[in-house]
A protein has these predicted regions:
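Internal, hydrophobic beta-strand segments that form the core of beta-sheet-rich folds
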Residues: 146-154, 158-176
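Secretory targeting and sorting signals
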Residues: 1-25
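Sequence contexts marking disulfide-bonded cysteines in secreted/extracellular proteins
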Residues: 49-51, 56-58, 167-169, 185-189
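Enriched for extracellular/lumenal, surface-exposed ectodomains of secreted and cell-surface proteins
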Residues: 114-127, 170-177
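Short structured motifs
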Residues: 45, 151-155, 185
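Short, surface-exposed binding/anchoring microloops in extracellular/periplasmic proteins
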Residues: 28-120, 179
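Aromatic sugar-binding surface patches on proteins
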Residues: 58, 124-154
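Short beta-strand elements
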Residues: 176-192
Length: 192
């Protein structure tokens, strides 16, 4: 009886090892918040998603106020500065990135002014930093940014799908007696 059980276990193990699970796109989301008052928070949301079939990672960020009535945009007298940092876990990987701020506008690789939202991208050896300045408040959609990046190996010039991908963001928000900066929200993912 024990031999039969051992043979069955060996057959099951062989089946598992010869038919590994298929990999899908890897995605991760992070959220941070800072209280404005007992009923209101400023939130920063970040999502990172790497797609193996495209050798490309995508990121999006959203900033909003959360009130007892739910998420909402910012008041009309708002001034805000958001920083997005895109990087890899490997110092030998640089990011070939583009972004839209606010989301839905044409992709940028340098900087732009869309709807009084000024943005600029700074490239370094192994990361990309996007600075977005908002003049005036509005709905949540105004405070969304998105983009994509191909993590590229310095030595080969080919996409690097082995290292982890990080998308991090924080925002400083100033309006009517409020001047607060959210903690940094970082989403980390891989290609598998």
């Amino acid at each position: 009886m024990n031999r039969l059980a051992a043979a069955g276990a060996a057959a099951a193990l062989t089946a598992v090892l010869t038919h590994p699970a298929t990999a899908t796109a890897a995605s991760n989301t992070a959220t941070t918040a800072i209280p404005v008052d007992p009923a209101t928070n400023i939130e920063m949301h970040v999502t990172a998603n790497c797609v193996s079939a495209e050798n490309r990672c995508y990121f999006d960020t959203t900033a909003n106020l959360t009130t007892p009535d739910g998420p909402t945009g910012f008041p009309g007298d708002t001034w805000a500065r958001q920083t997005i940092t895109i990087r890899s876990s490997s110092r030998d990987v640089w990011q070939e990135a583009s972004y839209s701020a606010p989301s839905g506008n044409p992709r940028e690789v340098k900087g732009a002014n869309h709807e009084n939202v000024l943005s600029k991208m700074y490239k370094a050896i192994n990361n990309v930093e996007i600075s977005i300045t908002y003049f005036g408040g509005g709905p949540i959609e105004r405070f969304k940014a998105d983009g994509d990046s191909v993590p590229t190996d310095w030595a080969t010039g080919r996409p690097n799908t082995q290292a982890a991908f990080f998308a991090c963001s924080q925002i400083q928000v100033v309006y009517g007696g409020v001047n607060l900066t959210t903690p940094t929200a970082c989403a980390q993912t891989t290609f598998n």
